Amino acid sequence: MNEAKTLVIRGNLVDIINRRTFGAEISILNGHIGKVIPTGQDEGSYLLPGFIDAHVHIESSMVTPAAFIHAAVRHGSIGAVADPHEIANVMGTEGVEYMLDNAKGIPFYTWFGVPSCVPATIMETSGAIIDADETARLLEREDLHFLAEMMNYPGVLNKDPEVMRKIEAAKNAGKPIDGHYPLATGPKLKAYIESGISTDHETIYLEKGREKCELGMHVLIREGSAAKNFDALHPLLKEYPEQIMFCTDDAHPSFLNKGHINRMVKKSLDLGYDLYDVLRAASYNPAMHYKIPAGFLREGDSADFIQVNNLKNLTIQATYIQGTCVYDGEKCTLPFHKPILRNNFHTKPIPLEKLAVKAKGKQMRVIVCEDRELITKEELYPVHTFDGFVESDTERDILKLVILNRYQTAPPAIAFIKGTGLKLGAIAQSISHDSHNIIAIGVTDFELMQAINVVIKAKGGIAVSCMDEVTLLPLPVAGLMSDESLEETSRRYEEIEEKIKRLKSPMDSLQMTLSFMGLLAIPSLKLSNKGLFNSETFQFTSLFV
C-alpha cells in the first residue's frame, strides 16, 4: 500500500490573521498543512492566501466554469462566488445545474448561488422562470450557497410578496443574500439592508460606499470588463478593512486571460495600502462571509495558497488548492475536456423586409448611449427616411437597433440609437442582458439581416457583418459560452473586436455597450424584444412622437 507523500515548501509566509510575515517551511499532507516551521531567514519568494472573486458571472467570460477555472488559477485565484444569473435566464434551473456539473470535481472553490431575478423583468421574454417556490427548493441544496444579487430593489422596498418569499427562503436556509442597489441612500438603503441583504457590488461613489459600510453592509470593489470602480472606492480598504471585498462581476475573455483579482491586489499595494488589509479583501473576507472552507496557511488548514516572486510584481509562481499544484508557473496542470452542449434557441432566420420601419411621425425617440456606460438618455430627433421608411443615418450617428426573441419566432423590436459612432456594417449577438435575446446594430438592413441570421444559424454567438463578409465567434453553450479553452476563446474574441474596430466606431467596446442596451432595470431608454421601454416610468413608449 502506497503511503501519501509529504510535500515541503519554503517561503516568506504572509499570515493575514495575525498580521505578520516570516520565513517558513510548510509541510503538506493529504491536502492539508501539517507543520508550519519558522526558518528565521528570508526565503525569497512569498506564500500568500489564494484570491477569491467575491462576485462574478462566469458566463460573461464566454467560457464554461471549467475553462474559467483554468484561467483564474494562473492569476492566483482559488475561488469565485458565482451567480449563474445569465444562463438561468436562458435555461432556468437546468442552466444552474449545468454550471454545477461542469465545475464538479475540479479543485477550485466555485461557490454558486441561486439567481434571484429570473426573469429580470416581465417586460421582456426570457427562456425560463425561477419563482419563489423553486428558489426555496434550490436554497436547500448544499451545493448552492447564497441568494444572488437582488436587483429588484423596488420589490424589496415595497415588500412584494414574491420577492420577500425568496429573501425569507434564504434566511431560513441560513444563507447570505447579495444586493444590487447602486444609488441607494438614506431610509431606502436602511430598509433594503434591514430586509436581510448584506452585500453590494454596484457601488460607484465613495460616499455611497461609506454610508453602506456604516450601516453594516459589505461593499465589493469591482474592477471588471464592464464596470471599473476601484479608483473611486479604494479608500474604503483603509477605512473599513473588515467589510471590503474584491470582485470582477463581468470578466470578458481577453480581460481574464491577462488578469483577475491579482490586478486589484497589485493596484492596492502600489498605492501603499496595508498588505494585510488588501489580502483580507482579496481572500479572507469573502471566505468568511460566504463560509468558503479555504485555508489561510495555518496548521490543519486546507492547503490553499499561492507562491509569488515578491510583493511588488506579484508574479504567480504556483497556485495550490487542497494540496494540489493547479498552476506551476507556466501552465495549468488541470485537464480540460470539451463540455457537453446545452442550449435554448428556437427562432428562425429573419427575412429582410422584417427589418423595415415605416415612418409614422416626423420625430422619433432615440436611445443615447456612452461607451462602457449602462445608463442611457432619451432624446428626440427628426426622422431620416427613404421612400417612407426610416433608415440609419451615419451623418448624425443614429443607427438602427434590433432585438429579436431567440426563444420563439416573433417579429423584431426596432429602435434607433445614438452614440456608437458606427460608420460601416453591423453587429449581432446573443449576449443581451438579462434575457439574452438577439441584439443587433447596423448601418444597412442587409448587413443587419446577415449578422442576425449567422447568429441564429450558429444558435448563439457574436457576428460582425461588413458588405458580404461575416465573422463569427460561436457561443454554442446556451448562446453565452464557447466550448473552447479561455485562451482560444480570447483569441477569437480579440479577432471579433478587431473586426468591430474596422466598422469605425470610436468606442472601446461597442460589443459590451450593445449587450446592455436591452437591460431594462437600468435607466433611461432601453429596448425590449416587446418594444421601446422607459426604465424611469417602467412603461413601454412609442418610437414616433
UniProtKB/Swiss-Prot annotation:
Hydrolase among keywords: yes
GO terms of biological process kind: adenine catabolic process
Molecular function per GO: adenine deaminase activity
Keyword Protein biosynthesis attached: no
Keyword entries, A-Z: Hydrolase, Manganese
Cofactor(s) required for function per UniProt: Mn(2+)
Enzyme class, first EC level, given as a word: hydrolase
EC number: 3.5.4.2
Reaction it catalyzes: adenine + H2O + H(+) = hypoxanthine + NH4(+)
InterPro entries named in the record: Adenine_deam, Adenine_deam_C, Amidohydro-rel, Metal_Hydrolase
Superkingdom as given in the UniProt entry: Bacteria
Assigned protein family: Belongs to the metallo-dependent hydrolases superfamily. Adenine deaminase family.
NCBIfam families: ade
Record's protein name: Adenine deaminase
Species of origin: Parabacteroides distasonis (strain ATCC 8503 / DSM 20701 / CIP 104284 / JCM 5825 / NCTC 11152)
